[in-house]
Amino acid sequence: MRIIFLDIHGVLNDHDDLTIHKNKIVLLNSILMETGAKIVLTSSWRYMVHKGDMTIDGLNYLFLTHGLKNMPLIDVIEADSPKSNLSRGQMILRWLKNCRETIESFVILDDLDDRPQGIAPVGQYLVKTNSNVGLTKKQVDKAIDFLKNPLLPLPI
């Protein structure tokens, strides 16, 4: 299975606008169609699932109304807490290690960087977006390359 760990703010929109931009969904769809990848949400939107305000199916439907194809969202990473002190990257790594399916490849789409509280220790799989611009065609091509030609060995 190929996985996209997806942030929303700064990837599917810019930080000045909280709505999902349809042109960014078109770009995300091109990654999904080219690779058959599934999505694990790393965005703060995951808290809606953890709090019980939304389900994975509900989020898939929300994305579908914005043009995302094939309802690809399969999970969200864990909720962080002040006690856990885990970076987003550490939560991604934990998700990978706990996944029951074989992970062929993965990519992280995020506007965070690989500093300790960012994406480390999986920063080499990051396609970093500019939070003022969001996802671009060049980044789409890089993400497709990561998913089709994974960096080996995977850290799991």
PLM feature spans:
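Hydrophobic/aromatic side chains embedded in well-ordered alpha-helices
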Residues: 1-3, 104-105
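C-terminal cap/substrate-recognition subdomain and adjoining C-terminal extension
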Residues: 58, 62-156
